A protein has these predicted regions:
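Surface segments flanking catalytic/ligand-binding clefts of nucleic-acid enzymes
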Residues: 3-19, 24-32, 167-336
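Short gly/ser-rich loop at a beta-strand->alpha-helix junction or flexible surface loop bordering the NTP-binding
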Residues: 1-190, 321-322, 327-336
Length: 336
């Protein structure tokens, strides 16, 4: 009996390990396995984050929200092979930037399967989903259909993060993107706002945080900065700094904007790239950028929660706010 229990335990732990290595949750239809796993939830470092889906607790606790959602979707697809995903869920599978605030209920294409409406799922009829594709073994709406579905319902700053990442992934121009939206989405609910988002999209934006700050600049009437401008280190021309935002104002003043938490530098030596302590590199880079004679303005993500204070910070940095630009954005976004 003890030997049988040990074999069962080793088999299940091996299956959990395999699921972890594959970036998914363990899904099982086997009642014996299910009973064993549920007996050991809370012990043996096993968790059941979704019904019938299991993983190691220490691994789950270490994941970001995005990683948790991705593993959940893959586990659900394993458990329900006839399920397909759209909207923000599909966007994650396609590798798009989906802000955490948009990650909640599942976005399911109703393919004749039994979907628990009580779970708050967002359902889409198959005939409305278009041609489905497979990404990492999961059925999802096509890339551009996914982007369009997201922009039709996303708030401005979140939608801009998704749109920027779509342009970055596919290398298409903003004009081509807007034309695609016009052809595919004209007449649909949310089309006008989707077009507003697309009209500001920029594939040079490297992540969702950068996109959301740019959305703030746009909505509050500040000039839109250049993105990912490169500077040579004045003390060491072999080192290149790439900054998040760069404003060149009418009076000739230049302001560099940096979103905290991301170090962008390339240090070359005889063998190629050399690693540098990130904290030291961040401080060194900032001090060297100031030697170029430019102001350096640092942003933290929490500042988006207090737009009034952020407006004042921009004013003190000398970046002019134009009420007419803010009004133009409000008119386009709200339709008045």
């Amino acid at each position: 009996h003890a030997t049988r229990n040990t074999l069962a335990r080793n088999r299940m732990l091996a299956r959990l390990t395999e699921a972890t290595e594959q970036g998914t949750l363990l899904a099982t239809h086997d009642n014996t396995e299910l009973m064993w796993l549920r007996r050991h939830v809370g012990t043996d470092d096993i968790a059941e984050p979704e019904p019938y889906l299991f993983c190691f607790k220490h691994d789950w606790d270490a994941l970001t929200l995005t990683e948790r959602v991705l593993r959940t979707i893959k586990g659900l697809a394993e458990f329900h092979p006839d399920w397909a995903f759209w909207g923000y869920d599909a966007a994650l599978l396609w590798g798009l930037e989906v802000p955490n605030d948009l990650l909640g209920p599942r976005y399911l294409v109703k393919t004749g399967c039994s979907v628990p409406l009580s779970a708050g799922c967002r359902l889409l009829r198959p005939q409305a989903a278009g041609v489905l594709e497979q990404v990492d073994g999961v059925q999802v709406t096509s890339f551009w259909r996914t982007v369009e579905d997201c922009l039709l319902r996303a708030p401005f700053s979140y939608g801009l993060a998704i749109a920027d990442s779509a342009l970055r992934a596919k290398g298409v121009s903003r004009d081509d993107f807007c034309e695609r939206l016009r052809i595919d989405c004209e007449g649909k609910h949310g089309h006008r706002r989707a077009q507003v988002i697309a009209s500001y999209a920029d594939g040079m934006s490297e992540n969702g945080g950068e996109s959301r700050f740019r959305a703030f600049f746009i909505a509050y009437g500040f000039p839109v900065p250049e993105l990912q401008v490169e500077f040579r280190d004045p003390l060491d021309p072999s080192q290149v700094f790439r900054v998040d935002y760069f404003w060149q104002l009418e009076d000739g003043t230049c302001v560099i904007g940096e979103l905290d938490g991301k170090v962008k530098y390339t240090l070359q030596n005889g063998e190629g790239r050399e690693s540098v302590d990130p904290f030291v590199a961040e401080r060194q880079r900032e001090s060297h950028l100031t030697m170029l004679g430019h102001k350096v303005l640092r942003f933290t993500f929490d500042e988006l929660k207090n737009p009034g204070k952020l407006v004042e910070k921009m004013r003190l940095a000398g970046i002019p706010r134009r009420p007419d630009l803010a009004e133009e954005w409000r008119r386009r976004w709200y339709g008045r």
